[in-house]
Amino acid sequence: EVKPNYKAKPGEEITLSYPYPVRETELVAENIPLDFVYEDDYLAVINKPTNMVVHPGYGNFEGTIANALLYHFDNLPKRDDFEGRPGIVHRLDKNTTGLMVVAKTEKALVELSKQFFDKTTERKYHALVWGDVEEDEGRIEGHIGRSLKNRKLMSVYEDGSFGKEAVTNYKVLKRYGYTTLVQCELETGRTHQIRAHMKHIGHTLFNDFDYGGEIILKGTTYTKYKQFVQNCFKLL
């Protein structure tokens, strides 16, 4: 082993040790129902439910959208950078509900991937956030990368010292006093982008346990709603 500050020298051989076990089994088809909103010979649009992972990863090797797609379709194309993810050209977070486009042919895969890369597609999401958002609309810019305190979560790095560029445009749809319904349009597609960006500007997503959205912060103007909100959480 070497120290974290060790500088590699030319000609040295580096061996990496992975903390997680390697998944050797191939992706298998699973009879999981999918909600198809649209389908033709080239693509399909599905309504992804909450609490469902898009593709296999550490801790989630079964019960994913990818497993379900293999059952419903034969010979789905794969992107080189999306290994083991048949027909998938974009992703949604596990707890996000929304429409996903699935490519059924190689040509559709190439064209759809290019559209997402060139940012000619529009991705809009509705989110209920804590607080009365100050501006009717706004733009959040800040690199997003793994949190240094919790690797499962993402953090915003405004100075661009870490993470990848991320841009979220938001617009207020309705104000409820202690919460606000906003529409978020993404220019980039980073993991937990909306969740991390909205928390960054002080408006965590309602009931987002991972980012602190399940509680009202002490000392805020919303503390008086604490009992009411706690009762709401009991009903969720």
Outline where the language-model segments fall.
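RNA pseudouridine synthases
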Residues: 1-236
